[in-house]
Amino acid sequence: YYGENGYKEICKRPDIDLVYIATDWAHHFPVAKEAMTNGKHAAIEVPSAMNMHEIWELINLSEKTRLHCIMLENCCYDFFELNSLHMAQEGLFGDVIYAQGAYRHELSPFWKHYWKNGPNDKLGWRLRYNKEFRGDVYATHGLGPIAQVLNIHRGDRMRTLIAMDTRSFNGKKQAEKYSGEPCDTFRNGDQTTTLIRTEQGKVMEIIHNVMTPQPYNRMYQLTGTKGFANKYPVEGYAVSAKDMKEAGVTPSNDDLSGHDYLKEADMKALVERYTSPIVKKYGDEAKEVGGHGGMDFIMDSRLVYCLQNGLPLDMDVYDLAEWCCLAELGSISMDNGFMPVEVPDFTRGHWNEVKGYKHAYAAPEDEAKALAEAKAFTAQLKAKGAKYWAAADKKATKKKGKK
């Protein structure tokens, strides 16, 4: 399969259950729509939808077909995020009232590597998208992990957002560098900040900056009534000795107040106490296999695990909608004097029915059965593939002999 429309033939195949979509942003939606229309689950790279029309189309199609539509947000599966989520779920931080996330990653060394649509396309698809669209166009790496901590559409929901940006300084220069022409309009500001207030009176702050020099940073900061977590630039936790003891962890001294980060020994003890079950199951293998430090492996493993065991996926189509909507809604806010914008309830009134975000797990006996069936199926596929390649090699050898 090849070419811009090859995916349509793939989606028609009866032997495929899920279509894994890792294209440029413009093709995420049409491929996902084609997949679900043809009875396939859709797993879509980030961001899965770029505007409200695409978001509602995916929701409607997923609900109509009863098929999974998941956004492949790998940053929800990094080790610090998984362990911190587990701590928050166990109440270590109290109520998390303010959470920050970001995508701060200067892309100037990479703009030239994004594919170009023909000889007249000098910018490449990603720089061109930033030139044409305002708002946080890549919010999900920062928003996804903190939305899980705040139980979004599982007891709380995003209610109102306000977005503000700088004007384009470096973005404009990058466009001029690659196009060789003056750039009068570059819509995306060098830095965009979005504030979101939830129904339960909590606040999320999301930052997007791919234009100015700075170390890679997804922020991931949780401010709770009893504790604090911070990933960038240095991983750390701040909790009191009293709360550590109540959690069953012996502090190095009784003077810990939460005013400073825990020392290495205390942090290690805390992480050992609250290591996520997912990290325990996949962590060692993830580090060995790699893929953004192992989080890609964990994400794909959880996706397959949930599908094999008939469980709800870790991220659903409503997560996709909430995490992607900042692009257009933020643009609306900024284009109208940085005014507050209401965030739709993508669940259509069901945001408070599930109490708390949770990962789903199968019973041990069911998990073992599903794993055995999967291994047997994989063995059959490998045998079939080996037979095919043996025949192909034999044919190639025979053809070579005739020459």
What is the predicted function of each stretch?
Residues 1-40, 56, 60-68, 375-403:
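N-terminal glycine-/serine-/threonine-rich beta1-alpha1-beta2 phosphate-ribose binding loop
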Residues 39-51:
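ADP-ribose/adenylate-binding Rossmann-like module
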Residues 65-68, 75-186:
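Predominantly a Rossmann-like dinucleotide-binding segment in NAD(P)-dependent oxidoreductases
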Residues 147, 215-223, 230-233, 240-403:
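C-terminal helical cap and adjacent loop that interface with cofactors, partners, or active-site loops
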Residues 36, 50-54, 77:
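Hydrophobic, small-residue-rich alpha-helical packing segments that form membrane-like cores
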Residues 194-200, 224:
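Active-site beta-strand termini and strand-to-loop segments that position acidic
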